[in-house]
């Protein structure tokens, strides 16, 4: 059984890695920010590869600071930045387009259309309210606006999810 638990807080502006001992004491930690992109008003994007690289760097730094052998990590917990949406090649694990951040409001018009058409019904069927920070309208936006990504999704080569599912 490992001696430590690693927590990764992959947040909206940076990533923190914290190593805890078996008594929940913090042994070591590391943090680093990554780049925010604002290509248009209301749009917020991240480079998923940069998120991954920063995350791996802070994990290594936290382990090094604590003098911890990676084999002594018993489990890893990941928390992430809400509904930020990543599309990646299932064969390589590489992202195929920028991540659309949960704060991004490019899907506001589409969300308004869905609410007007069947907002109450959607909530009743799914338990989810229709808002721009959810992944579903972001996924639809990518599939409608990035034909090269849609073609790869249709071919079964590209999959999508939130940051935590991609990092795992």
Residue ranges and their predicted role:
Residues 16, 51-55, 107-110, 138, ...:
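General structural feature for long, well-ordered alpha-helical segments within catalytic domains
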Residues 1-97, 124, 144, 151:
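N-terminal glycine/serine-rich phosphate-binding loop of ATP-dependent small-molecule kinases
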Residues 86-145:
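Glycine-rich phosphate-binding loop and adjoining helix at the ATP-binding site
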Residues 2, 10-12, 23, 122-168:
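Gly/Ser/Thr-rich active-site cleft segment
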């Amino acid at each position: 059984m490992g001696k430590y638990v690693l927590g990764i807080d992959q947040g909206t502006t940076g990533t923190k890695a914290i190593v805890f001992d078996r008594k929940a004491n913090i042994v070591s930690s590391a943090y680093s920010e990554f780049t925010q992109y604002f290509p248009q008003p209301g749009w917020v994007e991240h480079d998923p590869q940069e998120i991954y690289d920063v995350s791996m760097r802070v994990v290594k730094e936290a382990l090094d600071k604590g003098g911890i052998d990676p084999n002594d990590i018993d489990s890893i917990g990941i928390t992430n930045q809400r509904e930020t949406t990543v599309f990646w090649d299932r064969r390589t694990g590489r992202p195929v387009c920028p991540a659309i951040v949960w704060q991004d409001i490019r899907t506001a018009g589409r969300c308004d259309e869905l609410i007007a058409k069947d907002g109450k019904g959607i909530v009743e069927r799914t338990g989810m309210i229709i808002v721009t920070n959810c992944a579903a309208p972001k996924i639809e936006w990518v599939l409608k606006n990035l034909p090269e990504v849609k073609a790869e999704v249709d071919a079964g080569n590209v999959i999508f999810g939130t940051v935590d599912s991609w990092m795992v």
